[in-house]
């Protein structure tokens, strides 16, 4: 299904060619939704950008474009506003025809990308022997949303979890457990994640204070890297214990992801160093192998290198990231690789990507993107922590959201005098609580910090998950009240747009595909949230002003079709955010 924006763009390109010649066939006419609805539905800003090139006034250029523009049955006669904006008002009859096409489309008119690409989205990436905390929330749900958007656009998406499952910390932990709890190194389920975290902290304290223990820990690392069967088995047990706990979180959040941890790339690290050395990129600095890069300096202004091999011969995150990048390009054959991490890692990835380009690891046809995000803050404006100052565990944060959602639901049921089953209450509380956390995060521009507030995210008014879920449930109540089966509504029935609020709703429904394309380009999920929120508001205005069940035919069926299309659009949009819908709330 061709979107209105695409159709208008094609018409304007044809007009540009007619007015100014074939060399203008590649120029973007810059068609966007109108900034002020009173002037129209869409506007083209091309006349202003062509003024210098053509040496004419923008309004004169705009008039020449209009003189050569044929909109067929799509829009009214265009008008010129301000310095040269071309405004177009879409005809209600055209809107109705397009809405019917969207109604009959299983994808609701969402277009597939062209070309289809192999894309890797690297997100979540917790560390073994540590619990997932609030800091993992944003990477996990932003990465999942981006993957869902790319998938609905038809791309081949590989979701990768680059878990921290390798390094000195394992030698430290294994050495410590061998002393205090050797069963944990031979028996599955001997520890839960809480025990593992406690032992890790104790091992770290011992490592920092005891030089002899440091040597023991390093020997364990050497044995692990050499493939010693006993040490490797202990490492696998520790990884599996953490992995089970991670999966509990992923199940709660409905996250599908393929684990490929740092250890996977360990056999490739030596070759990465050789490759960088062969290309003359390595320089020794204080015994470490480094790559010096343009544009990176420390606070004193001295060159800041990327260390790829430590002075003791060990490797680090940068080495692993370079090996992972090469593997993803050569073996996974990715054409686009997206890294979703906090903004604090922006400098690291900028260095890694620059080294990879210098080493010719990244071909010109492969796009590498870092998607940074800001902090989650408490209502005091500081980084979100517990009252004692420790990092909040993600599981605790999610559980508390469900508890708050249940309290709100039970209060509302009491006020309404409704009796519901325990299964209903538990299910609605779970969906609303988890959805509220997700939506509160995704509705923010990811580059910004945001304030985490259960009260705000669980509110039934405003740009929140409960408001969206309630809008969907309200439409389902219409079908129950009128005993309507939306799926069996007359397929050939026409959509009739008469009232201003139903015209506005119809126009907005047709922007779905454009919004999803925009999110793919910008990787900003909040744009989809904004669209769904505005759609919900437009539906509510339509419902308040346009009788549905009490209307006479054919208006009754037409308005029911608009209700159905709105519900399906909300359901699809929320699913791309990882949020399920509720038939009743």
UniProtKB/Swiss-Prot annotation:
Keyword presence, Hydrolase: no
A GO BP entry: arginyl-tRNA aminoacylation
Classification via Gene3D superfamilies: Arginyl tRNA synthetase N-terminal domain, HUPs, Isoleucyl-tRNA Synthetase, Domain 1
Catalytic activity: tRNA(Arg) + L-arginine + ATP = L-arginyl-tRNA(Arg) + AMP + diphosphate
Matching InterPro entries: aa-tRNA-synth_I_CS (IPR001412), Arg-tRNA-ligase (IPR001278), Arg-tRNA-synth_N (IPR005148), Arg-tRNA-synth_N_sf (IPR036695), ArgRS_core (IPR035684), DALR_anticod-bd (IPR008909), Rossmann-like_a/b/a_fold (IPR014729), tRNAsynth_Ia_anticodon-bd (IPR009080)
Chain ranges for the short sequence motif 'HIGH' region as given in the UniProt record: 126-136
Keywords: Aminoacyl-tRNA synthetase, ATP-binding, Cytoplasm, Ligase, Nucleotide-binding, Protein biosynthesis
GO MF, any single term: arginine-tRNA ligase activity
Keyword Lipid biosynthesis: no
GO cellular component, one term: cytoplasm
Primary location group: cytoplasm
Localization, UniProt: Cytoplasm
EC number per UniProt: 6.1.1.19
Xref: PROSITE patterns: AA_TRNA_LIGASE_I
Domain of life (superkingdom): Bacteria
PANTHER family named in the record: ARGININE--TRNA LIGASE, CYTOPLASMIC, ARGINYL-TRNA SYNTHETASE
Subunit structure: Monomer.
Family: Belongs to the class-I aminoacyl-tRNA synthetase family.
Protein name in UniProt: Arginine--tRNA ligase
The encoding gene: argS
